[in-house]
């Protein structure tokens, strides 16, 4: 794991790159978050980071048995009778790197850079899904000038590979009457519904036959890429489908 000096140094590098982007408080918190390793199913470091963040603010902070972190912030003056709100984001990120990059997602923080109008990571995934949602909630929790009702910040784990954090929630952990999920693509849109998802397990009997053929390595790369949920209808090349077609022929 990063020692303290490495952690602080990486935050400084990241924040220097992002220091002129508004709102600065969100990008500051995103820089801090991205200095902490947070792969799915191995979120121990980021759980400890968020727990310490809430405790340092003097807010009621708990970690449930599966690893979700809940931070509660009382309503500001005059907002006590409004419906309490739950703000939710997930702590884990998709961990992918370029083939020519030597990077360990379990021990290293993400290095960010500004490229024109874009914030990018150097050779790895950025972690904006759902790091920007987490950073936004952190910024609201530490703000002193935003009127709000009672707030409950819910940081779930393992969204990318199983939803075990959300599935592990138990009745009574939250009291909020409105849930805001901060895991959408546009910051000026509010989604009021979701199609949901389905997991399918397919099995088939097969037998292995001996072969004296030559082994060939096939690599499919250079495709457009994209999110399997948001871009599935756009007809982009899919490496799995392309390889399947090659094997079929």
Regions found by a protein language model. Give the residues of each.
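Acidic/His- and Gly-rich active-site-bordering loop/insert found
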Residues: 17-117
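Flexible, glycine/charged-enriched surface loops at secondary-structure junctions
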Residues: 62-64, 150, 249
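Active-site metal-coordination/substrate-binding segment of hydrolases
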Residues: 79-155, 159-161, 166-168, 176-177, ...
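Short alpha-helical patches at coil-to-helix transitions and adjacent helical residues
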Residues: 47, 130-134, 240
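Midchain, well-structured core segments that form catalytic/ion-binding scaffolds
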Residues: 37, 109-111, 115-120, 124, ...
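Buried hydrophobic packing segments
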Residues: 50, 54, 134-141, 169, ...
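Short hydrophobic targeting helices and cationic amphipathic motifs
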Residues: 2-10, 15
């Amino acid at each position: 794991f990063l020692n303290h000096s490495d952690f602080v140094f990486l935050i400084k590098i990241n924040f220097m790159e992002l220091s002129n982007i508004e709102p600065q408080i969100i990008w500051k918190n995103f820089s801090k978050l991205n200095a902490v390793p947070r792969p799915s199913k191995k979120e121990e470091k980021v759980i400890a980071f968020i727990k310490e963040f809430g405790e340092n603010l003097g807010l009621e902070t708990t970690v449930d048995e599966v690893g979700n972190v809940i931070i509660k912030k009382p309503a500001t003056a005059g907002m006590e009778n409004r419906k309490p709100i739950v703000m939710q984001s997930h702590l884990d990120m998709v961990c992918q790197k370029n083939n020519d990059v030597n990077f360990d997602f379990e021990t290293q923080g993400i290095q960010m850079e500004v490229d024109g109008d874009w914030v990018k990571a150097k050779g790895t995934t950025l972690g904006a899904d759902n790091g920007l949602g987490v950073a936004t909630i952190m910024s609201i929790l530490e703000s002193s000038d935003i009127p709000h009702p009672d707030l409950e910040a819910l940081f779930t784990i393992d969204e990318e590979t199983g939803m075990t954090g959300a599935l592990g929630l138990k009745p009574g952990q939250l009291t909020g009457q409105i849930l805001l999920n901060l895991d959408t693509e546009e910051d000026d849109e509010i989604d009021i519904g979701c199609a949901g998802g389905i997991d399918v397990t397919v099995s088939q009997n097969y037998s292995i036959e001996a072969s004296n053929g030559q082994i060939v390595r096939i690599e499919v790369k250079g495709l457009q890429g994209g999110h399997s949920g948001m871009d599935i209808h756009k007809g982009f090349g899919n490496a799995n489908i392309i390889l399947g077609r090659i094997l079929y022929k």
